[in-house]
Amino acid sequence: AKKPSVEAVFHAYLLSLPGIKFVGHTHATTVNQILCSPRAQDFAVHRMFPDEIVCCSVASVFVPYTDPGLKLAQTIRSQTEAFVRKYQRQPRGILMKNHGIITLGATWQSLLSAKLMAEKAAKVFVGAAQLGGPEFFTEENIARIAGRPDEAYRQRALKM
């Protein structure tokens, strides 16, 4: 019989979070281009455009490189708990340095929307880097956009 993935522990933990029913883990090419660069944490904790905030939330959890297995699950847990304390919400994305992306949500649509938007944001980030670097939103702009009623309506329409 096949053995379960060494990453099963972090999947189980994430599925135990309030409101989380779906967890997806991929190694999206453009996202990994950034995660394998010195700009990985910048990409995780900053936002560049409104759709990124709507689909990927105000920031993503950033996990420094950790070997897969129990240690990675423990690091994901501690970084996720710190995110929840800081932002008072569950994350929609977890970006793992030199590894990949985890998206999570209450519906499969929210998981897919976050994954696709993270890949779009990665393409924008890489393109902006070629033109002198990305221009990030301020925390005030992020908070304002995240709190707009029309953006909340869009999230409901996207089943987020």
Predicted regions and their residues:
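Glycine-rich flexible loops
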Residues: A1-M160
